[in-house]
Amino acid sequence: MQRALNSITRFALIPVGIWGMVACGYHFQTAGVIPAGLEPIFIEVFENRTNQAGLETTVTNAVVFEFVKRNEAALARNAADASVVMKGVIRSVELQTISTRGRDVAGERQVTMRIDVQLVAPDGKVKWAAKNLSGQEAYPVSNDKFLNDDRQRVALGTVSTRIAERVYDRLIDNF
């Protein structure tokens, strides 16, 4: 009897769990449909206008990975084979202390990155653009400068991933 009751309870909870996910707006990422005429896309290395060396590689890799993960067929291997080229500019990286550990000693910092992205056709016309996309991530600060630099680099990687997701979502949602 107890075993039957446990099975009934388990099966009753499945629809409740599904309903809870749907009701709260949770949804899985989908590949989505990239508008006609914009495939395949070649992703150029982003321009880095910040003082963060190597950030252009981190951001570009995050965007490429997002496209590979969700719709690898949308990518061209080189610019000559592409319908459009994705060009991006990393506009800024800002650091802000968001908590302290005593007088004038940072306890936690937040890094904010802003980028612009556009899809450009071979004739130079901009087919799509997203300006001022931003993301932020907090990280703990210690007395060790090397550890702080590493934590900042990891935070910038996290922000790059979030912005890459936003770029893809914006592309499939804007049309």
Where are these regions (language model features)?
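Residues embedded in well-ordered secondary-structure elements
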Residues: 13, 32, 77, 104-106
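Conserved acidic
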Residues: 51, 55, 107, 151, ...
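Surface-exposed short loop/turn segments
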Residues: 70-74, 81, 85-130, 136-149, ...
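A structural "domain/chain start" motif
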Residues: 22-65, 69-80, 95, 143, ...
